[in-house]
Amino acid sequence: MAAAAAAAAASVASQAQAVLRGRLCDQAVVHSALRSSPDTNYSKLKYLVASSVSEACNNSVLLLGPRGCGKAAVVDMVLDDLKKDHPDAISVIRLNGMLHSDDNCATKEIARQLCLEHQLSFSKMASSDDNTEFMIDMLRECGLAHKTIIFVLEEFDLFAQGKQRLLYSLLDAMQSLTSQAVVIGVSCRLDADQLLEKRVRSRFSHRKLLFVPSSVDSLQRLMEHLLALPEDSPLPTNFRVVSYMDIDSGLLSMQSFMNALSSMQRQPKMDGLQDLSILELYILVCMNRLEDKEKSSYNFITIMKEYKSVQDAYKTSDKYSHTVCFRAFEHLLDRELISFADNKGRNQALEYRPVKLLISSRELAESLKLNTTCPAVLQKLLDRERYM
Amino acid sequence: MSQPVTPRRTTRSSASASPSPAPASPTSPPKSRPKPSPRRQLLAAAAAPPKEDGSSADALLAELPGRRAQAMDILRLLAPAPALPLMLHGGAATGKTRALLLALRYLRPSQRLVYAALRSLPSPRALFASLLSQLSATPFSTSSRHRVPDKPSDFVAALRDALNGIVSQGEVVYLVFDNLEVVRSWDKGGQLLPLLLRLHDLLQLPQVVLVYVSSATPDAYYSMTGSVEPNYVYFPDYTVDEVRDILMHDHPNPKLYSSFLSVALKPLFRVTRRVDELSAVLEPLFRRYCEPLGDLKAVPDEGMKRRLFEHVQSHLAVALNETFNVPMRASMDEIKDGGSAGKGSAKRQFAGKDGLSSELEFHMSVSAKYLLLSAFLASRNPATLDAALFDSTGGLDNRKRKRKSSQASMHMKDTIVEEMLMKGPGTFPLERLLAIFQCITSVSEDILDEIDCPGNMASESGTTGLMSDVLLQLSTLCNSNFLSKSRSCPLEGSARYRSNIDEDLALKVARSVNFPLSKYMYRR
C-alpha cells in the first residue's frame, strides 16, 4: 500500500520534472511573463512594428542588451502577435549574422525565404546581383500590395563587418516611398550602431531598445511563473536545480538549490591546480620563483636549473630526471596552466621556447594550502620568496 | 570541390550508429581494418540497444569507479528529453568520454547518438560531412549525389532538416562533440567555435541535446559577445584511492597486487596522476615484482612482502626516472598476446642506466656519426671559438689567456650564459659544419682508417668523394630529424642548420666511436 503510494508520488514527481524541464528549455515560455506587464520592451516594440504595419511606412530598430535578457524571445512574441492580428499583411525574413554575414550568402538567403513566403520558385544558380535586384523588386511589389516585410537580423554586429553592402542595399531600398519594410536588428554589443558606416547610419532610424538584466523583483516573479505548476498539484532556478530534484520526495528542496549553486560556481583554474601531481607543482613553484626574480623570459632549461638548485638546497626525495620533468612540463602545457610566451620559433625545440605562467602566485599559494598531500618544502619555497 | 569528404572512421561509426543492426559495410576490406580501440567499441556499444540485464544505474556506476558524482550529474542533466547543452571538462584520462558514452547507453531506448571526435576530423568540412552522414538514414558513400555543405549557413540548414526528420518521429538526438579544444587551433576555428557553442540557439529544437567534451577549461571558450553558458560537469583527476580501485579492477590475484600497489603506487603518484601513464609503468614493474615468486597465485605473507619489496625497490627508483611513455593500444595488446615478447621488451625497459648504451644501437655509418657530432658542436659552441678549438695542432690547451674577472665582466658573462640558455642550440651554415667535420675526422683519422672499407677508395681519392657522400648523409640526418634545416637567410642566401640532439645522446654517440667529445665542448 505504502509502496504503491510512493510509486505514484514518484511518477507524479517525474511528470512534474518533465513539465518544468520542458518549460525551462523553451525560450518562449521563459519570457512570456513579460507579455502581461505594460511599459516593457515588448509593448514598445509591438507598438512600433504594429504602427508601421498599419500606417504602411518603413522603420528600423535595434534591440541591444547582453545575452539572456530575452531579446529574441520578445521579437518572437511580437511577431507571433502580429501574425495573428494581420495574417496576410506581413512576411518575416530571418537572418543570423553568424551564418549570413557574407553578403552573397545573405542575399541568397533573403531571396530563398522571399520565394518560400510567396510561393515562387527559387533558383539556386541566381547571381548575387540577381538576388539583390529580386529583393528590391519584391520590396516594391509588397509595398504596392500593402504587405510589410519584416527583416529580423540576429547578431546584428556581425552584419556590420566589412563593406556592409547588405545593410546598405536593404536600408537604401527602404528609402523609397513604395516600399514597406521593417528592419529589426538584435545584438548583444551595445555599441552596435556605432559600427555602422556613415552611408548606412544616415539611412538608419536611430531607434534603440535597451534590454537590461532583470531586477530582483522581476526575477522573483519570473521564478514563480516558471516553477509554479499549471494545476494546483501538491508540488511546489533554473534547469540544474530541477535536474537535481529529488524524485523520491518530489520536492525542490533547498538542498537541490545549494547543490546546483555549488556546481555552477567553480573556478576552473583552481580545480586544475588541485589536480596536479607533486612534481608538476614543483615546476610551477620554480616558475613562480623565476618570475619573482624578475626574469624577463625563461624556458624549460632555465626552469630545470632552478629546480636543480632547489633540490640541491633542500635535498628532497622529489628529484627526478630531466625527461620525467619534461613530461610533467608537457602535462602543464596540456592543462593550459602555462603556455608559450610567443608564437615565434615554432621550429625550435620545445625546451628552448620561452614560457609563462597563466596563474597568479596568489592562486598557486591558495592551492598549495588546500592541497593536503603537498610537501611542506614547497609551501616554504613559495612563502620565503614572498617575504624576502 | 564537389567531392564530399567522408573519412573512413565516420562511415564506420555511422554504420554502427544507425539503430537497426546494420551489416558491416562491405566496401571496407576486413584485413586493412585496424583493431578497434576501446573507445570505438564503447561507441558501438553506446549505439547498440542495451542488454536486458546490465542496464541498471548500479551497473553503470560499477563500470565507472571513482566517477560516481559525475555519472549521476550527467544522468540527471541529460535524462528526460528536453535538456540544455552540457559541457564535460577535465584533464586528459579522467574518463569524460567513457562516462558520457556509458551514460548514453544507459539512457538508450528512444535516443539517437551522433558522435563527432573533432580530433579526427581535420576541417569544418569534414565535421559537417561526418555529422550529416551519421544523421542521414542511408549512410552516404563518397560517390553519392549529396553535396557536403562547406558554408556554415548551408550546414545549419542541412542539419536542421536532417534533425527535424528524426525529431518529428519523437526521437531524441544527442549530438556529441568530443575534443572541442582542438577547434581553437583550426584554420577558421575562431568562427566555427561560436557556431558550435550556439548551435542550441540556432537550431531551436528542444529534442536535440548538445554535449561538448573538452579537456580545456570553460574559460577557454569565452568570446567577446558571449554565449549562453552550457551546464558544466567537471571531471577532476583521480585520487590515489580511486586509482588503486581502477587498477585493482578485475585483477586475477588481488592480494598480491594490492601489496604491490601499496609499495609502488605512492611514489609514482607523486610524479604523475594520469591513470594511463601509471598503468603503463606499473605493468612491467609488477612483472618484475613477481619474479622471485614461483607461483603467481600465491598469497603473500609479511616476510614475503618484505622480500619482494627489497627486490623491487631498485627497479622502482629506475622507473621513477624514466619517461612515462604510453604505448599505443595496439602495441600493448601485442605485448599481452605474446608473453615471451612482452617479457623481452620489459627487460629492455628495465635494463638500467648502464644498459641504455647497449640498447642505443642506431645503424648509422661512422661518418654519419661524426657528422652528427660536428653538427652538435657547431650548434653548441660559439663560432668565434672554432679557431681556438680546432687549431691545426689539434690541441686546445693553448687557451691560457685568462681575462681578469672584474665585476663587470662577470656580469656580462652571466648575461651571455643566460642568453645561451634562452636561445638554445644555435644555427650554423653548411661551410662551418663541413670545416668542423674535416677537423674532427682528421684528428681521429687513425680510427677512421681502421674502420674504413678495405678498398679505401674514398680516402685515397681525396676530399671530393668524401664530400658528396657527406652531403647525402646530411640530408639523411635532416630527414630523420636529428638536424633541422631552417629557412635560408635572406642576406646570405644559404640554408642554415641546427642540431636537435641533446648532450646525453651526443655523448653516447661519441663514446661509440671513441671520440673525446667533452674536450671540444665549450664550457661556460
From Swiss-Prot, chain B:
Q: Name one GO molecular function term.
A: DNA replication origin binding
Set out the biological process GO terms recorded for this chain's protein. Answer: DNA replication initiation; response to sucrose
Per UniProt, the keywords (alphabetical) are: ATP-binding, DNA replication, Nucleotide-binding, Nucleus
Extract the SUPFAM superfamilies matched here.
P-loop containing nucleoside triphosphate hydrolases
Q: Where is the composition biased (Pro residues)?
A: 20-31
- Any Pfam family from its record, for instance, is ORC5_lid
Compositional bias per record (Low complexity), positions renumbered to this chain: 1-19, 39-49
> Which residues does the annotation say bind ATP?
90-97
Matching InterPro entries, A to Z?
AAA_16, ORC5, ORC5_C, ORC5_lid, P-loop_NTPase
Tissue-specific expression: Expressed at low levels in the shoot apical meristem (SAM), leaves, ears and roots.
Primary subcellular site in the record, as a coarse category: nucleus
Q: Return the annotated region ranges for Disordered.
A: 1-56
> Which top-rank group of organisms is this from?
Eukaryota
Entry GO terms, CC: nuclear origin of replication recognition complex
Q: Where, per UniProt, does this protein localize?
A: Nucleus
Give induction info: Reduced expression upon sucrose depletion-mediated cell proliferation arrest, and accumulates after sucrose treatment.
Q: What does this protein do?
A: Component of the origin recognition complex (ORC) that binds origins of replication. DNA-binding is ATP-dependent. The specific DNA sequences that define origins of replication have not been identified yet. ORC is required to assemble the pre-replication complex necessary to initiate DNA replication.
Q: Which family does it belong to?
A: Belongs to the ORC5 family.
UniProt cross-references to PANTHER family, sorted A to Z: ORIGIN RECOGNITION COMPLEX SUBUNIT 5 (PTHR12705:SF0)
Q: How does it assemble?
A: Component of the origin recognition complex (ORC) composed of at least ORC1, ORC2, ORC3, ORC4, ORC5 and ORC6. ORC is regulated in a cell-cycle and development dependent manner. It is sequentially assembled at the exit from anaphase of mitosis and disassembled as cells enter S phase.
Name of the protein described by the UniProt record: Origin of replication complex subunit 1
